[in-house]
Every structure is written in C-alpha cells, then in structure tokens.
Amino acid sequence: MKFLFDYFPIICFFVAYKFWGIYIATAAAMVVSALQVAIYWIRFRRFEKFHVITLIFILLLGSFTLVFHNAIFIKWKPTIVYWIFAIVLFGSHFFGKHTLVHRMLKEKIELPAKTWSRLNLSWALFFLILGVLNLFVVYNFDTNTWVNFKLFGTLVLMLVFILGQAFYIARHAQNLKMNSR
C-alpha cells in the first residue's frame, strides 16, 4: 500500500498527461504531491523525507515548466532528485557511524558492516544511473516516450533492483546466521 502511495503523484502525472498534456500533468503532479505530504503528516504526524524532497523539486521545476511553458524543467526533476539521493547515500559513508541504508534497515536486518557498505554504494550508484538514464530518454526521445519511461521504465528498473538487493541481503544474512552458530 505504501508503494502505491509513494507512486501516486507519478500515476496522476501519467493519467493527466495522457488526457490533457504535459502542462496539466505538471500542475496535477504539483497538487497531488502537496496532498501526499499533507496526508502523510495528518496520518503519522511526521514528514517522509522522500516526499518532501520530491515536493520541493516538483513545485520549483513544475512552476518553471508552467511559467516558461517549457517541459524541459519537469523532465529534469527525476534526475535532480535521483542525484540528490545518490549524493546523500554516498556521503553517508563519510558522516556518522553507519551508512544511510544501515541506519534505515538495521532494526529489521542484521548484516556485516562490509555488506551494509556495499548495499549503500549500490543504491547510490543505482540512483546515479537512473538520473543519467532519465536524461538520455529526455534528450533522445519524445515527451510521450519520456512519460512512459518515467512511470513504467523506472518502476520496472526499481523492482528489478530491489529484487536483486533482496537476494544479496538474503545471501549475506544467511551467511551471518550460519557463522554465528
């Protein structure tokens, strides 16, 4: 359910684009992203950092898109957000006792420090590559292809990557259990 909630602005953007075009889709994504942050706050009394970062950039770049009537701004939004995530993940290797991925999952999974480090770096690299891939699609394909890639392409890539990470975690968590006996 959370996955659907996280993807709701993208789904609304996609549907609005298919019926009314890029500018209505941009405005719809701006409104739905603001609603997403508000609903999360009302329900949990806290903000989800991912939602807030996305909201900031969708409001900023969405406004530029609407004011200048140029879709390039909204097309750059995923790349900027992905690269911010990559920088934060990579930077977490140098600040604090544990990497960001370790801090997020340590209550649920027990892994060796080296495995946490590899997981964190793989997520940073994944987001870096997603940002580059988004720009490749932006500059080499039409807007319709980009919108389809933004929803379906990144969703499939994310699911495949998460599945790969799950297998990697399972292998190392199992090794940890065997070694502790």
Swiss-Prot record:
Upper taxonomic lineage: Bacteria, Pseudomonadati, Pseudomonadota, Gammaproteobacteria, Legionellales
Bilayer-crossing regions: 8-28, 53-73, 76-96, 121-141, 149-169
Locations listed in the record: Cell inner membrane
Function field: Plays a role in cell envelope biogenesis, maintenance of cell envelope integrity and membrane homeostasis.
Entry keyword annotation includes Transmembrane helix: yes
Domain of life, per lineage: Bacteria
Name of the protein in question: Inner membrane-spanning protein YciB
Topological category with respect to the lipid bilayer: Multi-pass membrane protein
